[in-house]
Amino acid sequence: MRAAGCGGTGVAALTTKLSRSISQHQPKSMPQASVNSEQNPSVPNSPSAHKPARSQSAQSAPSRAKWFVRFFRSVFGYRKTSLTFLVALVFAATLLLSWADSSLDFSVDMPTSKHEQAVLSRSWESLQKIARTKHTYTSEGNDEVHAYLEAHIASLVAKKPYMELDTDKNGTRRVMFDVKYLSYDSVSYYESNNLVVRVNGSDSSLPALLVSAHYDSVPTSYGVTDDGMGVASMLGLLEHYSSVAQPKRTIIFNFNNNEEFGLYGAQAFLAHPWFSQIAYFLNLEGTGAGGKAILFRGTDYGIVRHFSSVRFPFASSLFQQGFNNRLIHSETDYSVYIKAGLRGLDLAFYKPRDIYHTTRDSIQNTNIKSLWHMLSSSLDFVEHVSSQTIDLDEEVHAEAGKRDLALYTSFWNHFVVFSVSQVVSANIALLVVVPVASLLLLFIIFRCNKGWGFNFVNAIKYPLSLVASVLVLTFVSQVIIVPSNPFLVNSSIGLLVATLFSLFLLLNYIVLNGLNLVFKSFKGHQHDEKLIVMCESSFLTWILLLWSTVKLSHNKFGDDHTGELFIPILFSLQAVACFLGFLGWCFKPSKKVKVSREEHQPLLSSNGSNYGTQDDDDSLAPSSSLSLQSGFSENCEVHETKSFSYDWLVQFLVIVPISSLIIFNSGSLILNGLNKSIQESLSAQNLIYKFIQIFVIVWSIPFLPFIFKLNRIIVLALSLVLLYGFFAVNITDAFNDANPLKLRFLETISMDTSPPTNLVTVSARSMDVVKDILEDMPSLKDSKTELSIDSLGDGMSLYSYETPLIPHLVPGVKNLTDYLSIDVLKDSSSVSDSPFGLLTGELKINVPRNRNCKIDFNMSNTVIKVSDTKFMESKRSPVRTVIVYNEDKYENKSSSVIGAGVPEGFSRDSKGNSVFKDMDGISQLQLNKLNWDKPYHIGFQWVPEIVESESVWSEKIRTKKLGVNIECYWGDLDQLAEKDKAGNPVVQDRVPAFEELLHYSPSYVSWANRDRGMVSVTKYIEV
């Protein structure tokens, strides 16, 4: 029996055989046989006519067979109802699985062993004590945390003879180094008080493993996530190793200080004598507030693959790519260790950034399960590396440039990692094999005349739809959404993604089906259009894969592509689905001569070959290479069989579920890590909206081959989401209690005026709401002070006003002028050097109860003379050498110390003074000391006018004067207890202006520090 149509293929052969088998075993009805016998005497009567009547059960067998086939086809055929059900199921599964993967409740189990429970309990108790008060480096709370840690660590170390503690007491370990990262470009002097613990291993020949975290916080934060969690995890590790057998490998713990404003503690540790033992490291950090700890970065594939030993791995090299390409504007101690040649990992909390560095980074906004996730990951990794010899031990001294970077990801506690070379090799294979195999199959299809009516109209529909939809999506995003509510992503990133995703799918649905209506009379215009869309999507992914492969093969810092592991996976899924379609056409019988309709008969029913409901929504698709109705018109050639195929189902299951999950999971991970950075700059805002558009487009592509058959229910649902989204965009608050507006505060007292000015500055995005909040402060309204707004560029503004609220930073200090005084011990007029020689300056800076000052050397006085006699401002500082004296000596023969014999970089003179020389110029000197009351005593040498190579340096006006600006910071926010004149105790806020802002700001505002402290005092002098 032959059937009319163009739709059968080889993939559906089993279905065809099933239909034939049922047809062959189906009994003929008695009346029909009699009629045939009577009408055609030449045909003998059917034997069945002489057989006794069948039983009722035998007669119902055909009905049961027909019912089974109908059910099978109605469920698995290419019908709108079936497709709609699967699409809805994929959406639900994607959202649910992605949420569960990032959820602590569903992906992390609490410890079950008594030992781990005890370790976690003590670690949580330690975290509570660390976070009892704010403890920035410039606060007394920092000393309290240091004292607690030292006592607790000492008690643990005492339990084992092979454990030892080293403390940098009283600033005995003094270092100087240049700090050049992010916005920092300075030379720093630092007195370390790190707490360093060594757990000596049984095999001293093995290189040591470093575990590092910092115990300081920013002035406005309790430092729970940043970085109390890391410190508590390290205490948990020490607790563990103080109660188990000696590890094979030595483990060194660096509890370092003052990370927040220059990574000082980690940098100082490089000078520690134990550092030379170390080859590997694990850095514990927090750039968010709670949640799950994610593997941010890894130095290379060799060390990253050992992260598979972790029981609850949570990782994505997308963050590594973001860090390496400077999309994330923060740094961790990881960067110090990697520059020192170590190999290791950066494990950190990553969201949300609007709570990060604010008072909301507290115990109440985290939980013990977050701590357990970081602690368990640290415990597993450290135990794995320290308990055995690993393969990396043989290549400890391998050059960093020769190490292969890693691409990695995780899902539901399964960790996957590949090296760059492995991915590049696999990508090249895919780039070559897939096109060759596809062309071979296409050659067979067209060479053997399989009847695929591919033409220009088929090819152009999808690109037209894609381009038109992208243009409309961009217009809606940039012209409608951004102007109406630009900061919406801060609070409602899901709403925005859902709205734009619905819009993009609907646009493609309308355009593609609209083109089908326009070309309805065109022969073959719908011939297997889903396969054509798959092929074109596969081609686009192939181009993306080619670009990614080229970039990966030349991967470098600043142009990193190690987060693109998903690209070859998505391309492979697209390619497999296309192969299925091509194979179906290859096994399809060749075209035959058209025969009359009367020669054909339905397989199972005289009513037609289309089973199931005849409603348009549930009709079997006529647009599949393997569909039940692949003929488009009566002019279509006839084939040997008509197969009721289900290739669409296989293709759907190959492409859509996995692709949707990978794309959504990766995209949501990035957005959750970046969306709060919209408050940090206009460029960050543009980046986020651009990424949302890319995310929506990429997430839609797996669904587009099947967009033609979307049920009206899905279309209605998408329309409702779109309408609600457009409505909600205009009424949803960008900032609320859960997603606060983040403002940054600094109060600056300038000694350059008389009386001193007391100025509050607040930095934030340029928006009216900030102005309204500040102008509503009682002190502004009472003093009738005018708010000044200055642009900082990149969408940021500086809001400033003079405040009558005087800070109380130090007990006993009543006058603002007592906070900073400068003694000039030596200036340019005190030496007889020629204008072309080095001039020397020496200062004593007196500041009570202070730990941090910054000195900027004025570059505006220095010009460079070029050959065309024009003058231009030099960006180089005239200062070449700085010295920090250990003792408070006012008469120091610095000229004999600072001379031509001083080496570049950091050195110490014969008296132990710290010297740093940089012939490129020193524009800023950061001073960090541990003694609260000791003055700063510094010296420096500069070049007022000198010939170096082709450049001539000279002063603009004051040939022998150097501008020096001193700014000192206080960061303590605890209340100050004093006694009044009558001897009664009086408690005062240290920074009343900040407390006023905290008290009167709306609940949707969170406050952070602008700089190294909450209050700074400045003074400008010339020497």
UniProtKB/Swiss-Prot annotation:
Top enzyme class: hydrolase
Cytoplasmic side: 1-80, 447-461, 513-529, 586-643, 709-712
Residues that bind Zn(2+) 1: H214, D226, E285
SUPFAM superfamilies to which the protein is assigned, alphabetical: Zn-dependent exopeptidases (SSF53187)
Cofactor note: Binds 2 Zn(2+) ions per subunit.
Active site: E259 (proton acceptor)
Residues where Zn(2+) 2 binds: D226, E260, H357
EC number: 3.4.-.-
Ranges facing Vacuolar side: 102-425, 483-491, 551-564, 665-687, 734-1023
Keyword annotations from UniProtKB, A to Z: Glycoprotein, Hydrolase, Membrane, Metal-binding, Metalloprotease, Protease, Transmembrane, Transmembrane helix, Vacuole, Zinc
Subcellular location: Vacuole membrane
Required cofactor names: Zn(2+)
Pfam families cross-referenced by the UniProt entry: Peptidase_M28, PFF1_C, PFF1_TM
Hydrolase in keyword set: yes
GO biological process, one term: proteolysis
Glycan-carrying positions: N170, N200, N490, N675, N815, N858, N892
Entry function: May be involved in vacuolar sorting and osmoregulation.
Name of protein: Vacuolar membrane protease
Species of the source: Clavispora lusitaniae (strain ATCC 42720)
